[in-house]
């Protein structure tokens, strides 16, 4: 059930990120609350793992502040939410996978379009990364 929730959340967030370049705050809040409730009901991961998962998103938000918004705060909020569900290690894998996929895409855009300053939504790469992690 959690996997379907995560996939559904990332699909909705990806669509929003592509269309509007922002992610609905209410979507992030609702998904986060559901994750916290499931954490206490299912007790599938340790509190330490939960906190490490949250920390990854917090670090992305800090990077957003340091880079003056070059990295979106919404991306960090998404990773905070996924951290509640996935824990530290898998959330880190999700982030690294998303970064690798977006880097590959950026290289292809650079090679074929030569538009270096194009803004690219990040959440769709997190969705693809999550699907790959679930397949492997």
What are these regions (language model features)?
Residues 1-136:
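A membrane-topology feature that recognizes alpha-helical transmembrane segments
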């Amino acid at each position: 059930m959690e996997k379907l929730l995560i996939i559904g959340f990332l699909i909705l967030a990806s669509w929003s990120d592509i269309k509007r370049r922002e992610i609905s705050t209410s979507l992030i809040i609702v998904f986060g609350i559901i994750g916290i409730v499931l954490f206490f009901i299912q007790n599938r991961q340790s509190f330490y793992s939960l906190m490490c998962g949250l920390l990854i998103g917090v670090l992305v938000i800090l990077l957003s502040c340091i880079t003056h918004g070059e990295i979106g705060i919404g991306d960090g909020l998404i990773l905070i939410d996924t951290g509640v569900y996935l824990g530290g290690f898998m959330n880190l894998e999700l982030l690294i996978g998303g970064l690798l996929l977006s880097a590959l895409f950026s290289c292809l855009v650079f090679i074929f379009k030569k538009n270096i300053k194009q803004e690219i939504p990040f959440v769709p790469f997190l969705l693809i990364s999550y699907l790959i992690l679930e397949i492997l």
